[in-house]
Protein backbone atom coordinates (compact mmCIF):
# COMPACT_ATOMS: atom_id res chain seq x y z
CA UNK A 1 0.00 0.00 0.00
CA UNK A 2 2.87 2.34 0.88
CA UNK A 3 4.49 1.53 -2.48
CA UNK A 4 1.31 2.57 -4.30
CA UNK A 5 1.24 5.77 -2.24
CA UNK A 6 4.65 6.76 -3.59
CA UNK A 7 4.27 5.38 -7.13
CA UNK A 8 0.89 6.96 -7.97
CA UNK A 9 2.03 10.61 -7.57
CA UNK A 10 5.12 9.76 -9.62
CA UNK A 11 2.94 8.43 -12.46
CA UNK A 12 0.74 11.55 -12.37
CA UNK A 13 3.82 13.78 -12.45
CA UNK A 14 5.39 11.78 -15.29
CA UNK A 15 2.23 12.01 -17.40
CA UNK A 16 2.04 15.75 -16.81
CA UNK A 17 5.52 16.04 -18.34
CA UNK A 18 4.65 13.91 -21.38
CA UNK A 19 4.33 15.44 -24.84
CA UNK A 20 1.21 14.28 -26.66
CA UNK A 21 1.97 13.65 -30.35
CA UNK A 22 -1.13 11.88 -31.72
CA UNK A 23 -4.68 10.93 -30.73
CA UNK A 24 -7.07 8.46 -32.35
CA UNK A 25 -10.74 8.41 -31.33
CA UNK A 26 -13.09 5.67 -32.54
CA UNK A 27 -16.73 5.79 -31.49
CA UNK A 28 -20.04 4.18 -32.28
CA UNK A 29 -22.80 6.49 -33.51
CA UNK A 30 -25.38 7.79 -31.03
CA UNK A 31 -28.87 6.58 -30.12
CA UNK A 32 -30.97 5.55 -33.11
CA UNK A 33 -34.33 4.10 -34.02
CA UNK A 34 -34.74 0.34 -34.62
CA UNK A 35 -33.51 -0.68 -38.06
CA UNK A 36 -36.30 -3.06 -39.10
CA UNK A 37 -39.49 -2.09 -37.28
CA UNK A 38 -41.03 -0.60 -34.13
CA UNK A 39 -43.57 -2.28 -31.87
CA UNK A 40 -46.08 0.53 -31.22
CA UNK A 41 -47.57 3.74 -32.56
CA UNK A 42 -45.95 5.59 -29.67
CA UNK A 43 -42.55 4.31 -30.79
CA UNK A 44 -43.31 5.25 -34.40
CA UNK A 45 -44.05 8.80 -33.29
CA UNK A 46 -40.98 8.98 -31.04
CA UNK A 47 -38.59 7.77 -33.75
CA UNK A 48 -39.94 10.36 -36.17
CA UNK A 49 -36.80 10.58 -38.33
CA UNK A 50 -37.39 7.02 -39.52
CA UNK A 51 -35.98 3.54 -39.06
CA UNK A 52 -32.26 3.45 -38.36
CA UNK A 53 -32.07 7.23 -37.98
CA UNK A 54 -30.78 9.16 -34.98
CA UNK A 55 -33.02 10.35 -32.16
CA UNK A 56 -32.92 13.73 -30.45
CA UNK A 57 -31.19 11.99 -27.53
CA UNK A 58 -28.26 11.21 -29.82
CA UNK A 59 -27.72 14.89 -30.51
CA UNK A 60 -27.26 15.50 -26.79
CA UNK A 61 -25.04 12.41 -26.48
CA UNK A 62 -22.85 13.63 -29.34
CA UNK A 63 -22.59 17.09 -27.80
CA UNK A 64 -21.43 15.55 -24.52
CA UNK A 65 -18.62 13.50 -26.04
CA UNK A 66 -17.74 16.54 -28.15
CA UNK A 67 -17.34 18.51 -24.93
CA UNK A 68 -15.22 15.72 -23.40
CA UNK A 69 -12.90 15.80 -26.42
CA UNK A 70 -12.86 19.59 -26.50
CA UNK A 71 -11.86 19.86 -22.84
CA UNK A 72 -9.16 17.23 -23.31
CA UNK A 73 -7.59 18.26 -26.63
CA UNK A 74 -8.72 21.64 -28.00
CA UNK A 75 -6.29 24.46 -27.15
CA UNK A 76 -3.94 22.11 -25.29
CA UNK A 77 -3.25 19.82 -28.27
CA UNK A 78 -4.94 21.18 -31.40
CA UNK A 79 -5.65 24.77 -32.36
CA UNK A 80 -9.08 26.02 -31.22
CA UNK A 81 -9.41 27.89 -34.53
CA UNK A 82 -9.84 24.48 -36.24
CA UNK A 83 -6.94 23.95 -38.61
CA UNK A 84 -8.02 21.23 -41.07
CA UNK A 85 -4.44 20.03 -41.55
CA UNK A 86 -4.27 19.01 -37.88
CA UNK A 87 -7.47 16.97 -38.05
CA UNK A 88 -8.91 13.94 -39.77
CA UNK A 89 -12.63 13.42 -39.22
CA UNK A 90 -13.68 10.25 -41.04
CA UNK A 91 -17.11 8.60 -41.00
CA UNK A 92 -19.01 5.63 -42.31
CA UNK A 93 -21.32 6.95 -45.06
CA UNK A 94 -24.41 5.89 -43.10
CA UNK A 95 -26.46 8.93 -42.04
CA UNK A 96 -26.44 8.17 -38.31
CA UNK A 97 -22.63 8.03 -38.29
CA UNK A 98 -22.31 11.21 -40.33
CA UNK A 99 -24.77 13.13 -38.14
CA UNK A 100 -23.00 11.97 -34.99
CA UNK A 101 -19.51 13.03 -36.04
CA UNK A 102 -20.77 16.35 -37.43
CA UNK A 103 -22.38 17.16 -34.08
CA UNK A 104 -19.20 16.14 -32.24
CA UNK A 105 -17.13 18.40 -34.51
CA UNK A 106 -19.53 21.32 -34.11
CA UNK A 107 -19.22 21.03 -30.33
CA UNK A 108 -15.44 20.78 -30.32
CA UNK A 109 -14.89 23.78 -32.59
CA UNK A 110 -17.47 26.50 -32.06
CA UNK A 111 -16.75 28.78 -35.02
CA UNK A 112 -15.83 26.22 -37.67
CA UNK A 113 -16.94 22.68 -38.42
CA UNK A 114 -14.18 20.16 -39.25
CA UNK A 115 -14.57 18.68 -42.74
CA UNK A 116 -15.81 15.09 -42.54
CA UNK A 117 -14.45 12.59 -45.05
CA UNK A 118 -16.34 9.51 -46.21
CA UNK A 119 -16.57 7.14 -49.18
CA UNK A 120 -19.40 5.16 -50.74
CA UNK A 121 -20.55 2.21 -48.65
CA UNK A 122 -19.43 -0.58 -51.05
CA UNK A 123 -15.93 0.91 -51.16
CA UNK A 124 -15.56 1.70 -47.45
CA UNK A 125 -13.45 -1.06 -45.93
CA UNK A 126 -12.22 1.24 -43.17
CA UNK A 127 -15.42 1.91 -41.20
CA UNK A 128 -18.17 -0.23 -42.75
CA UNK A 129 -17.94 -3.87 -41.58
CA UNK A 130 -18.21 -6.21 -44.56
CA UNK A 131 -20.73 -9.02 -44.15
CA UNK A 132 -20.83 -10.51 -47.65
CA UNK A 133 -17.38 -12.12 -47.78
CA UNK A 134 -17.38 -15.53 -49.45
CA UNK A 135 -15.50 -17.27 -46.62
CA UNK A 136 -18.10 -16.15 -44.08
CA UNK A 137 -20.75 -18.35 -45.68
CA UNK A 138 -18.50 -21.35 -44.98
CA UNK A 139 -17.98 -20.24 -41.37
CA UNK A 140 -21.70 -19.72 -40.86
CA UNK A 141 -22.39 -23.13 -42.37
CA UNK A 142 -20.20 -24.69 -39.69
CA UNK A 143 -21.95 -22.73 -36.94
CA UNK A 144 -25.54 -23.32 -38.08
CA UNK A 145 -25.47 -26.35 -40.44
CA UNK A 146 -26.87 -24.23 -43.25
CA UNK A 147 -28.83 -25.88 -46.05
CA UNK A 148 -28.25 -24.88 -49.66
CA UNK A 149 -31.35 -22.71 -49.47
CA UNK A 150 -30.01 -21.08 -46.28
CA UNK A 151 -26.75 -20.29 -48.05
CA UNK A 152 -28.61 -18.61 -50.90
CA UNK A 153 -30.58 -16.50 -48.43
CA UNK A 154 -27.41 -15.60 -46.51
CA UNK A 155 -25.72 -14.45 -49.72
CA UNK A 156 -28.69 -12.23 -50.55
CA UNK A 157 -29.15 -10.96 -46.98
CA UNK A 158 -26.38 -11.63 -44.41
CA UNK A 159 -28.70 -10.48 -41.60
CA UNK A 160 -30.54 -13.76 -42.14
CA UNK A 161 -27.65 -15.30 -40.15
CA UNK A 162 -27.99 -12.73 -37.38
CA UNK A 163 -31.65 -13.71 -37.04
CA UNK A 164 -30.60 -17.36 -36.72
CA UNK A 165 -28.14 -16.46 -33.95
CA UNK A 166 -30.82 -14.37 -32.23
CA UNK A 167 -33.30 -17.24 -32.28
CA UNK A 168 -30.68 -19.72 -31.05
CA UNK A 169 -29.77 -17.45 -28.13
CA UNK A 170 -33.44 -16.79 -27.33
CA UNK A 171 -34.20 -20.51 -27.28
CA UNK A 172 -31.32 -21.05 -24.83
CA UNK A 173 -32.59 -18.33 -22.48
CA UNK A 174 -34.88 -19.38 -19.63
CA UNK A 175 -36.40 -15.92 -19.44
CA UNK A 176 -37.00 -15.42 -23.17
CA UNK A 177 -37.45 -18.99 -24.34
CA UNK A 178 -41.06 -18.40 -25.39
CA UNK A 179 -40.35 -15.01 -26.96
CA UNK A 180 -38.46 -15.98 -30.11
CA UNK A 181 -41.01 -14.19 -32.33
CA UNK A 182 -40.75 -10.91 -30.44
CA UNK A 183 -38.84 -7.94 -31.83
CA UNK A 184 -36.26 -7.86 -29.04
CA UNK A 185 -33.85 -5.33 -30.62
CA UNK A 186 -36.72 -2.84 -30.99
CA UNK A 187 -37.99 -3.45 -27.46
CA UNK A 188 -34.51 -2.77 -26.06
CA UNK A 189 -34.35 0.61 -27.79
CA UNK A 190 -37.92 1.51 -26.88
CA UNK A 191 -37.32 0.71 -23.20
CA UNK A 192 -34.08 2.70 -23.27
CA UNK A 193 -36.07 5.63 -24.65
CA UNK A 194 -38.58 5.41 -21.79
CA UNK A 195 -41.44 4.27 -24.03
CA UNK A 196 -44.17 1.84 -23.02
CA UNK A 197 -43.24 -1.82 -23.52
CA UNK A 198 -45.18 -5.05 -22.82
CA UNK A 199 -45.46 -6.03 -19.14
CA UNK A 200 -43.48 -9.22 -19.68
CA UNK A 201 -40.50 -7.12 -20.83
CA UNK A 202 -39.42 -6.35 -17.27
CA UNK A 203 -35.91 -5.55 -16.03
CA UNK A 204 -34.89 -9.21 -16.03
CA UNK A 205 -36.12 -9.71 -19.59
CA UNK A 206 -34.41 -6.48 -20.63
CA UNK A 207 -31.01 -7.56 -19.26
CA UNK A 208 -31.36 -11.02 -20.79
CA UNK A 209 -32.29 -9.39 -24.12
CA UNK A 210 -29.01 -7.47 -24.12
CA UNK A 211 -27.10 -10.76 -23.93
CA UNK A 212 -29.30 -12.34 -26.60
CA UNK A 213 -28.83 -9.30 -28.83
CA UNK A 214 -25.06 -9.47 -28.28
CA UNK A 215 -25.08 -13.05 -29.63
CA UNK A 216 -26.75 -11.80 -32.81
CA UNK A 217 -24.05 -9.13 -33.14
CA UNK A 218 -21.23 -11.53 -32.26
CA UNK A 219 -21.84 -13.78 -35.25
CA UNK A 220 -21.81 -10.79 -37.60
CA UNK A 221 -18.70 -9.24 -36.03
CA UNK A 222 -16.80 -12.57 -35.72
CA UNK A 223 -16.24 -12.40 -31.94
CA UNK A 224 -17.16 -14.44 -28.86
CA UNK A 225 -18.36 -17.97 -29.57
CA UNK A 226 -18.28 -17.11 -33.28
CA UNK A 227 -14.72 -15.78 -33.22
CA UNK A 228 -12.82 -15.80 -36.49
CA UNK A 229 -9.45 -14.10 -36.94
CA UNK A 230 -10.11 -13.67 -40.65
CA UNK A 231 -13.58 -12.29 -39.93
CA UNK A 232 -12.14 -9.74 -37.50
CA UNK A 233 -9.41 -8.88 -39.99
CA UNK A 234 -11.74 -7.96 -42.88
CA UNK A 235 -13.98 -5.89 -40.58
CA UNK A 236 -11.48 -3.92 -38.54
CA UNK A 237 -8.04 -4.88 -39.88
CA UNK A 238 -7.68 -1.89 -42.19
CA UNK A 239 -8.52 0.58 -39.41
CA UNK A 240 -6.04 -1.13 -37.08
CA UNK A 241 -3.41 -1.09 -39.80
CA UNK A 242 -3.97 2.62 -40.41
CA UNK A 243 -3.84 3.58 -36.74
CA UNK A 244 -0.70 1.55 -35.98
CA UNK A 245 1.05 2.94 -39.06
CA UNK A 246 -0.01 6.47 -38.12
CA UNK A 247 1.46 6.04 -34.64
CA UNK A 248 4.76 4.74 -36.00
CA UNK A 249 4.91 7.54 -38.56
CA UNK A 250 4.34 10.20 -35.89
CA UNK A 251 7.09 8.71 -33.71
CA UNK A 252 9.53 8.68 -36.66
CA UNK A 253 8.62 12.27 -37.50
CA UNK A 254 9.36 13.46 -33.96
CA UNK A 255 12.62 11.50 -33.89
CA UNK A 256 13.72 13.36 -37.04
CA UNK A 257 12.45 16.65 -35.66
CA UNK A 258 14.81 16.99 -32.70
CA UNK A 259 15.82 20.48 -33.85
CA UNK A 260 12.29 21.56 -34.74
CA UNK A 261 12.86 22.09 -38.46
CA UNK A 262 9.84 20.07 -39.64
CA UNK A 263 6.19 19.92 -38.61
CA UNK A 264 4.59 16.73 -37.32
CA UNK A 265 1.14 18.24 -36.84
CA UNK A 266 -0.62 16.77 -39.87
CA UNK A 267 -3.68 14.74 -38.84
CA UNK A 268 -2.45 14.50 -35.28
CA UNK A 269 -6.05 14.23 -34.04
CA UNK A 270 -8.09 11.62 -35.90
CA UNK A 271 -11.75 10.93 -35.14
CA UNK A 272 -13.69 7.99 -36.62
CA UNK A 273 -17.47 7.44 -36.52
CA UNK A 274 -18.56 3.84 -37.09
CA UNK A 275 -20.83 0.95 -36.03
CA UNK A 276 -21.11 -1.58 -33.19
CA UNK A 277 -20.09 -4.33 -35.63
CA UNK A 278 -16.71 -2.65 -35.94
CA UNK A 279 -16.30 -1.61 -32.30
CA UNK A 280 -16.70 -5.25 -31.17
CA UNK A 281 -13.90 -6.74 -33.33
CA UNK A 282 -11.68 -3.70 -32.70
CA UNK A 283 -11.90 -4.25 -28.94
CA UNK A 284 -11.40 -7.98 -29.45
CA UNK A 285 -8.27 -7.40 -31.53
CA UNK A 286 -6.81 -5.25 -28.74
CA UNK A 287 -7.71 -7.99 -26.26
CA UNK A 288 -9.95 -5.77 -24.12
CA UNK A 289 -13.50 -6.59 -25.29
CA UNK A 290 -14.72 -8.29 -22.11
CA UNK A 291 -12.83 -5.90 -19.84
CA UNK A 292 -14.44 -2.94 -21.60
CA UNK A 293 -17.97 -4.28 -22.15
CA UNK A 294 -18.46 -7.07 -19.68
CA UNK A 295 -19.24 -10.67 -20.59
CA UNK A 296 -21.61 -11.12 -23.54
CA UNK A 297 -22.71 -7.50 -23.74
CA UNK A 298 -22.86 -5.18 -26.77
CA UNK A 299 -21.24 -1.73 -26.91
CA UNK A 300 -23.55 1.13 -25.99
CA UNK A 301 -24.29 4.11 -28.19
CA UNK A 302 -21.36 6.53 -28.45
CA UNK A 303 -19.02 4.15 -26.67
CA UNK A 304 -15.52 5.24 -27.61
CA UNK A 305 -11.94 3.99 -27.77
CA UNK A 306 -9.25 6.65 -27.40
CA UNK A 307 -5.60 5.94 -28.19
CA UNK A 308 -3.08 8.58 -27.13
CA UNK A 309 0.56 8.50 -28.24
CA UNK A 310 3.05 10.56 -26.25
CA UNK A 311 6.75 11.14 -25.68
CA UNK A 312 8.15 10.90 -22.18
CA UNK A 313 11.84 11.79 -22.03
CA UNK A 314 11.84 11.27 -25.82
CA UNK A 315 10.61 7.68 -25.39
CA UNK A 316 7.28 6.94 -27.15
CA UNK A 317 4.41 5.43 -25.17
CA UNK A 318 0.73 4.75 -25.74
CA UNK A 319 -2.29 5.02 -23.46
CA UNK A 320 -5.65 3.42 -24.28
CA UNK A 321 -8.94 4.61 -22.81
CA UNK A 322 -12.52 3.41 -23.12
CA UNK A 323 -15.70 5.39 -22.64
CA UNK A 324 -18.50 2.88 -22.15
CA UNK A 325 -21.62 4.94 -21.50
CA UNK A 326 -23.00 7.88 -23.50
CA UNK A 327 -23.42 9.84 -20.23
CA UNK A 328 -19.82 9.35 -19.07
CA UNK A 329 -17.51 12.34 -18.80
CA UNK A 330 -14.60 10.24 -17.49
CA UNK A 331 -12.49 7.72 -19.37
CA UNK A 332 -11.47 4.26 -18.18
CA UNK A 333 -7.77 3.51 -18.51
CA UNK A 334 -7.40 0.17 -20.34
CA UNK A 335 -3.68 0.45 -21.15
CA UNK A 336 -2.46 -2.38 -18.92
CA UNK A 337 -5.07 -4.76 -20.36
CA UNK A 338 -4.15 -4.35 -24.03
CA UNK A 339 -2.60 -7.37 -25.70
CA UNK A 340 1.24 -7.34 -25.41
CA UNK A 341 1.28 -4.28 -23.11
CA UNK A 342 2.84 -4.68 -19.63
CA UNK A 343 0.01 -5.56 -17.20
CA UNK A 344 -0.95 -3.03 -14.54
CA UNK A 345 1.28 -0.37 -16.09
CA UNK A 346 0.16 3.20 -16.80
CA UNK A 347 2.04 3.36 -20.10
CA UNK A 348 2.63 0.92 -22.95
CA UNK A 349 5.81 1.25 -25.04
CA UNK A 350 4.94 1.99 -28.66
CA UNK A 351 6.87 -0.99 -29.99
CA UNK A 352 4.81 -3.35 -27.79
CA UNK A 353 1.50 -1.69 -28.61
CA UNK A 354 2.09 -1.74 -32.37
CA UNK A 355 2.88 -5.46 -32.17
CA UNK A 356 -0.40 -6.22 -30.41
CA UNK A 357 -2.57 -7.37 -33.24
CA UNK A 358 -0.62 -8.93 -36.10
CA UNK A 359 -3.15 -11.66 -36.92
CA UNK A 360 -5.97 -9.09 -37.11
CA UNK A 361 -4.28 -6.54 -39.42
CA UNK A 362 -4.64 -6.26 -43.17
CA UNK A 363 -3.76 -3.64 -45.74
CA UNK A 364 -6.10 -5.19 -48.33
CA UNK A 365 -9.41 -6.36 -46.81
CA UNK A 366 -11.11 -6.22 -50.20
CA UNK A 367 -8.79 -8.93 -51.48
CA UNK A 368 -9.35 -11.08 -48.37
CA UNK A 369 -13.10 -10.58 -48.40
CA UNK A 370 -13.67 -11.24 -52.09
CA UNK A 371 -10.72 -13.57 -52.56
CA UNK A 372 -12.53 -16.14 -54.69
CA UNK A 373 -14.12 -13.49 -56.90
CA UNK A 374 -10.80 -11.70 -57.35
CA UNK A 375 -9.02 -14.95 -58.18
CA UNK A 376 -11.78 -15.88 -60.61
CA UNK A 377 -11.59 -12.50 -62.33
CA UNK A 378 -7.81 -12.76 -62.54
CA UNK A 379 -8.14 -16.30 -63.87
CA UNK A 380 -10.66 -15.22 -66.49
CA UNK A 381 -8.48 -12.30 -67.54
CA UNK A 382 -5.40 -14.55 -67.82
CA UNK A 383 -7.26 -17.13 -69.87
CA UNK A 384 -8.55 -14.48 -72.25
CA UNK A 385 -5.06 -13.09 -72.77
CA UNK A 386 -3.61 -16.54 -73.38
CA UNK A 387 -6.41 -17.29 -75.81
CA UNK A 388 -5.65 -14.15 -77.81
CA UNK A 389 -1.96 -15.04 -77.85
CA UNK A 390 -2.73 -18.55 -79.09
CA UNK A 391 -5.07 -17.16 -81.73
CA UNK A 392 -2.37 -14.74 -82.86
CA UNK A 393 0.26 -17.47 -83.05
CA UNK A 394 -2.14 -19.73 -84.93
CA UNK A 395 -2.99 -16.98 -87.41
CA UNK A 396 0.70 -16.23 -87.94
CA UNK A 397 1.52 -19.90 -88.53
CA UNK A 398 -1.44 -20.23 -90.89
CA UNK A 399 -0.22 -17.27 -92.95
CA UNK A 400 3.29 -18.75 -93.07
CA UNK A 401 1.80 -22.10 -94.13
CA UNK A 402 -0.22 -20.45 -96.91
CA UNK A 403 2.81 -18.54 -98.16
CA UNK A 404 4.98 -21.66 -98.09
CA UNK A 405 2.28 -23.65 -99.88
CA UNK A 406 1.99 -20.95 -102.52
CA UNK A 407 5.76 -20.85 -103.02
CA UNK A 408 5.93 -24.65 -103.14
CA UNK A 409 3.21 -24.82 -105.82
CA UNK A 410 4.84 -22.02 -107.79
CA UNK A 411 8.22 -23.72 -107.60
CA UNK A 412 6.67 -27.01 -108.70
CA UNK A 413 4.92 -25.39 -111.66
CA UNK A 414 8.12 -23.65 -112.70
CA UNK A 415 9.97 -26.98 -112.54
CA UNK A 416 7.34 -28.63 -114.75
CA UNK A 417 7.57 -25.83 -117.33
CA UNK A 418 11.36 -26.11 -117.35
CA UNK A 419 11.23 -29.87 -117.90
CA UNK A 420 8.75 -29.51 -120.77
CA UNK A 421 10.90 -26.84 -122.33
CA UNK A 422 14.00 -29.04 -122.14
CA UNK A 423 12.08 -31.95 -123.64
CA UNK A 424 10.87 -29.84 -126.58
CA UNK A 425 14.37 -28.57 -127.28
CA UNK A 426 15.67 -32.13 -127.40
From Swiss-Prot:
InterPro entries reported in the protein's UniProt record: Acid_Pase_AS, His_Pase_clade-2, His_PPase_superfam, Histidine_acid_phosphatase
Sites where a glycan is attached: 37, 145, 380
Keyword Thylakoid: no
Enzyme class (EC, first level): hydrolase
Keyword Transmembrane helix applies: yes
Disulfide bond positions: 133-369
Locations listed in the record: Membrane
GO cellular component terms, A-Z: membrane
Catalytic residues of the enzyme: 29 (nucleophile), 276 (proton donor)
Reaction(s) catalysed by this chain's protein: a phosphate monoester + H2O = an alcohol + phosphate
One Pfam family it belongs to: His_Phos_2
UniProt keyword terms in alphabetical order: Disulfide bond, Glycoprotein, Hydrolase, Membrane, Signal, Transmembrane, Transmembrane helix
Origin: domain of life: Eukaryota
GO molecular function: acid phosphatase activity; phosphatase activity
Extracellular topological segments: 19-388
Membrane spanning residue stretches: 389-409
Family, as annotated: Belongs to the histidine acid phosphatase family.
Protein name: Putative acid phosphatase 1
Amino acid sequence: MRVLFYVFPFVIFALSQAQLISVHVIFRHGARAPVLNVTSEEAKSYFYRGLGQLTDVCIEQAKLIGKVLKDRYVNTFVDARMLPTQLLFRSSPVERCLMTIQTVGNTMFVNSTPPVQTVAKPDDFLLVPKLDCAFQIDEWTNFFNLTENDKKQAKKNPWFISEKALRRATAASQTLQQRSDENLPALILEKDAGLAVPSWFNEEAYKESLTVFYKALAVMSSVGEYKSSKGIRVKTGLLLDKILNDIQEKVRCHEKNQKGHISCDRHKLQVFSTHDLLILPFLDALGIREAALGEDLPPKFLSAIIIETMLLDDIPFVKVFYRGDPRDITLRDMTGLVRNCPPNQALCPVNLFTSCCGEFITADPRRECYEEKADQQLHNWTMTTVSWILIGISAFLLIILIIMSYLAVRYKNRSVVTIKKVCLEN
